[in-house]
Each structure stands twice: as structure tokens, then as C-alpha cells.
Amino acid sequence: MSNPDDLDDGLAYDFDAEHEVIFDAKDGSPPTKKVQKRSIEQDDDDVDDIDGKKEERNSEDDSNRPISKRQKKLQKKSKLIEKKKEESQYIVSQRKALPASSPEKIIEYLTTLIREKNPDLSVLELEELYFKRNDFLSTEKFDAERRLSNFPAFIQKFSVAPKKIVFSMSNIRVADVYRSLNGGKNCVKLFSKSKLKDDIATVERLLTDSSKKSNKNKDSLYFIATPTRMQKIIEATDLLFQGKEKLDIILDASYLDPKDNTILSFENAAVLCQVLKTFLNKKSSVKILLY
């Protein structure tokens, strides 16, 4: 019996998965061996699979690798820095929002400030320093941005008193507020750039001249000062407490200095509170407004 493998029947038999032998049945030409090649895409996929497995193993190794003490300290420090940054941003946003807040919120803020600045005082002593709801006029309805260009409009809308004291936190800011009101003979700057005796003389002159005029001819008087300078002036003269005319005290509370402090959070905020209480105790018809 003949071996089936020896038969030349013109059919191709697949003996190797990677090699394909083809016989030409027509002309009996010798078989041609064709190699089946893998595609480039298949090779790339295999490489990607290998790389992916390596990366996965490396990632697992990194996650299982113990963190050094130095790395732990750096991570802890980074978290603390981020937390302090968030707290700082929150405090700044609160300071910006305070001037447009209700009198109740303003009083709550000042009460906290007074307690922090006077840790050694008793409860009864602190009560004498706290402010009351009727000490303030609400300015919540002022919708415009609280910048110097809108300050005259704010004054016109909320302040009707013939005498106005504007408190700003620095000499430079006092000068800026003075310019926003166009200066003039009824507007005076009271700060440390001038001699104290000259400032006192200026206050006395303005008040004396104003008292000689009739009510119809009187213009509003503006005393723009830092808290520390006003403290020294009222220690030297009582003229600002005299008379029954209304007095509005306006706090330039929207301005933030380069350190994000306002007049209610800077180093002399306690002095400001003392000066405000002095006016409320010694002068009738006093109202406080925040700009």
C-alpha cells in the first residue's frame, strides 16, 4: 500500500502554523514557501502590554515602598501651607464683606476684637467697651463698589450730619480720601505729617468759623484722620464734643493695605475702638457708618 504522504494530489497540507507551502496544480512547478509575518500593529500591542505591566508593577512597588521621614515632613508641611492659605483667603473675604454687613454682624466682629485686645479685663469692664445696635447706621443698601471714586456718592446717600469724621488707617490713605472729596476749605487732613498743635489749631478754627454761620449757609465739615492722631486731638481739646449738632463717623473699612489688613484689623484697631467709644460717651447724636 502506498503512503498517503507520497501522493501528489495537488493539494496543500499545513504542517507548520507559521509556514504555508503552496503547490501550483497547473504547471507542476516546485512548491513556493511563503512565511506568514506578524503585523506591526500586533508587535506594538505586545510591546504596549509589556510596558503597561512594567508600569503597573512599578506603580505597585512605589505604593508599597515606605515613605521616608523627610518625605513625611514635606507632605505635612505642604498640607499646613495649603490650610493656612485657605484660612487666609477666608479671613480676607470676611474683611471685605464686613462694611456692607448688618449692624448686628459689625457689632459681633467688634465684640470679638475688643475681647482679643483686652484679655485681662473682667466681663463687666468689657461690657463698657462694647458697642450697641443703635450706635451704627446700616449701609447695606449701597450697591456700588466701595472704592474712592464712589465715596462722595456714598456720603450724599447716607450721611446728613453737618460734621463728619472720616477715619482711615494710614497717612497715605488719609490723603487719598481727602482728594476724593476734592479737598477745600471745609475739609481737613489730620495726621502725623503735620504738627499736632497745627492740627488742633485747624480744628478750632473750622469749628469756630462754622458756629458763626447760619444753618442755611453752613457746609459740611470733614475731618479726615488716623485713629492715633484723633486720639491725641480729643485729649487736647473738647471742641469736637460740643454742640447738639449731629456727628457722623465714617470708617474707611473697605480699603485693604498690602498685608490685607483693614482699619478694623490693623495694629491700631484697638485705638480706633477707644476713640469711637469716647465720641459716643461725650457727644450726643453720634452715628457710625462703614464704607
UniProtKB/Swiss-Prot annotation:
Presence of the UniProt keyword Membrane in the record: no
Disordered: annotated segments: 22-79
Composition skew (Basic and acidic residues), residue ranges: 50-64
Superkingdom to which the source organism belongs: Eukaryota
UniProt GO cellular component terms: 90S preribosome; cytoplasm; nucleus
Positions of post-translational Phosphoserine modification: S59
Keyword flag Nucleus: yes
Major location (coarse): nucleus
Keywords: Nucleus, Phosphoprotein
Basic residues compositional bias, start-end: 67-78
Stated family: Belongs to the CMS1 family.
Extra facts: Present with 1200 molecules/cell in log phase SD medium.
Function: May play a role in the regulation of DNA replication and cell cycle control.
Protein name, entry field: Protein CMS1
Gene: CMS1
